Amino acid sequence: MNNKIIETLEFHKVRQKIEPYLLTEQGFEELRQLEPMVEVHRIQQAFDELTDIAQIFVENPYFSLAATSDIGPAMRRLELDTDLNIAELLAVKKVLEVSKSLLDFYGNLENVSLSQQLDKLFEKIELFPHLQGSLQSINDAGFVEDFASEKLARIRRKIREAEDQVRQVMQDILKTKGDMLSDSILASRNGRNVLPVKNTYRNKIAGVVHDISASGSTVYIEPRAVVTLNEEISHLRAEERHELNRILQELSDMLRPHGGVIRNNAWLIGHIDFVRAKHLFARDHQAVVPKLSEKQDIALLNVRHPLIAKPVPNDLYFGSQLTAIVITGPNTGGKTIMLKTLGLTHLMAQSGLPILADKGSRVAIFKEIFADIGDEQSIEQSLSTFSSHMTHTVEILRAADQDSLILFDELGAGTDPQEGASLAMAILDDLRLRGIKTMATTHYPELKAYGIETSGIENASMEFDSNSLRPTYKFMQGVPGRSNAFEIARRLGLSDIIIQSAQSWTDTDSDVNRIIEKLESQTVESRQRLDKIRDVEQENYKMNRALRKLYDELNRERENELNKARLEAKEIVDMALAESEDILKNLHAAASLKPHQIIEAKAELKKLAPEVVDLSKNKVLKKAKIKREAKVGDDIIVTAYGQRGTLTNQLKDGRWEAQVGLIKMTLAKDEFELVKAEKAEQPKKRQVHTVKRANVRGPKARLDLRGKRYEEAMMELDEFIDQALLNNLAQVDIVHGIGTGVIREGVTKYLRRNKQIKEFGYAPQNAGGSGCTIVTFK
């Protein structure tokens, strides 16, 4: 398809209307590359995908998926044996997570019958539970967790201990030499903890000067007592960076062999996102999937222009027996809009997009669409309007064939009316003989007679309301346009004498205008009747859908009730059989019956039992069972450590292998909890503390605020208390240490204000004493 028609009909604006519905970068890329297709099977494949996604939305109206970014550059870096950074690893992690969520969604689909097209997309997605588990060591904020490796955990523990010592030393100096300081708050310079010392006391505190204030009144000194500790922290930070780089390299090496498959997963996710976006566009714009006609038999029902805010719907029939439709009549009535609507509708359909029309519409497939629309006069070439249009027309006539659609706006305009009309008829006749479908607009009256007298050519016009003197923009197929100049002039106040005089000059055309006026009236009446019929059909269609849905629901309820009744009946019969067995034993013991009589009696009783109900195929029970059982690829929380991982394999003894960061663990069923799937469009929130649901007798939760800044500690305390209340905890411990008492005082004030707190107090001496507060909830 030539690029000129895409620009002329503003197809790029249609793409822009679909953009807001996309969630993935790959989906955006597919939309950017979207162009009309000419292969029937490719267009039909796109339409089948739209039909399938519509079926999914009937049962799952909120179907969505999480946003993903472009991992193409990251995969190319892996191919070049380069390691990925944290942002790139996070992007890959998100692709793996969305892959799993889509496969889980597909596996749980019920009451949906899909064609092979969408089935294939879901089935081509591959899972990598080991990789997914390893990437859990990087949280969604881009922080590499301590459990990524034992060495990293050890280094960070040492850093925290050293920093605690530094803070303790600094706090001691603040207490003992506070009068020498210009501020009671610790400062930081060049990455070192320093004291803001008054310049007059700079020699009283031994240490390294790192900075002086602008006024010179304050000197920032790193006390000698913490220099060694700070040096140790710097060394540990360097070790931490080295270990982080090693972890990133290890994760990159794990991903490298699977780069191609992961890239394909990203494409599949993006394509499903693109199909979903097309469906949402169709839903919001009342668009439909049209039928394809290989015989160029076009039928557009209530078709609308997609770029107009409040378009007027029109019917357009361009059957295989027609080669041209000529829209005659005055300007400003919407003739050009009809041209563009026909062209743009076919560009959309051949791009696999739904069209703004009613169900039952048909479109043709054209290898090329040409258009000469608007004033394309070339100033550089010093061409007149007529020359410019004719140059373009010549190019179109040379390039067009039977698989083309041609759109002419004001064919033959810009020159002598008689010659222009003759040229227009000659051009249309040439295209008619060559069997090339054409729609043309014109204001030449000569073309009305040409349309009536020539086979394969049909007249059309745009309706004009003579009462309001405004165009209605209604397309009237089969009715040539007529002039409304006399009627407009009369309503605007021109004298009847002048109008009658003018009419006397055009008596030869008056009969034709009266016939056209009558045809217009009949067409309007027919259209109104057709609209009423369509309204009734639409109501019937809605009623049928509602009845079908109700019928399906009743069938499901009936099946559920029958299964319930069978189970109850089986329980009753089992109880009866058990009781009868006891009775028969007693009778046999009493020798009141002969053995063969007992056997016969038991046989008769067993006849009362119904056949065993096979519930293995019950979809509801199967789905419930799936929800209760863990499976490979599920995200978990290791209860002993509160760390997140992924199940990778189930062992024969019932235990599970799980990947937690870079560590593989073997866990029993009661040593982990399944993580519930998060909603697709909501980003995962990082939880600072994992609090398990507990009752009054359950385990306690503990929050450690030691070493935190006051603001950070208060934020974590607030979040921790909220989580404890949400999880029904009865009691929690808050470790704040003794230190300067600032955080301890802040904790006390917070707890006093919280109405959900029943009581709180310091822990016993053997459990932390005044450095720990025990909180009991109401």
UniProtKB/Swiss-Prot annotation:
Domain of life: Bacteria
Gene3D superfamilies to which the protein is assigned, alphabetical: 3.30.1370.110, P-loop containing nucleotide triphosphate hydrolases
Binding residue positions for ATP: G329, P330, N331, T332, G333, G334, K335, T336
CDD domains referenced in this protein's UniProt entry, alphabetically: ABC_MutS2 (cd03280)
Statement: the UniProt record of this protein carries the keyword RNA-binding: yes
Annotated GO biological process: mismatch repair; negative regulation of DNA recombination; rescue of stalled ribosome
GO molecular function annotations of the record: ATP binding; ATP hydrolysis activity; ATP-dependent DNA damage sensor activity; endonuclease activity; mismatched DNA binding; ribosomal large subunit binding; rRNA binding
Keywords of the record: ATP-binding, DNA-binding, Endonuclease, Hydrolase, Nuclease, Nucleotide-binding, RNA-binding, rRNA-binding
InterPro entries on file: DNA_mismatch_repair_MutS_C, DNA_mismatch_repair_MutS_core, DNA_mismatch_repair_MutS_sf, MSSS, MutS, MutS2, P-loop_NTPase, Smr_dom
Enzyme Commission number: 3.1.-.-, 3.6.4.-
Matches recorded under PANTHER family: OS10G0509000 PROTEIN-RELATED, SMR DOMAIN-CONTAINING PROTEIN
Cited HAMAP family: MutS2
Family membership noted in the UniProt record: Belongs to the DNA mismatch repair MutS family. MutS2 subfamily.
Subunit structure: Homodimer. Binds to stalled ribosomes, contacting rRNA.
Biological function: Endonuclease that is involved in the suppression of homologous recombination and thus may have a key role in the control of bacterial genetic diversity.
UniProt name for this protein: Endonuclease MutS2
Species: Streptococcus suis (strain 05ZYH33)
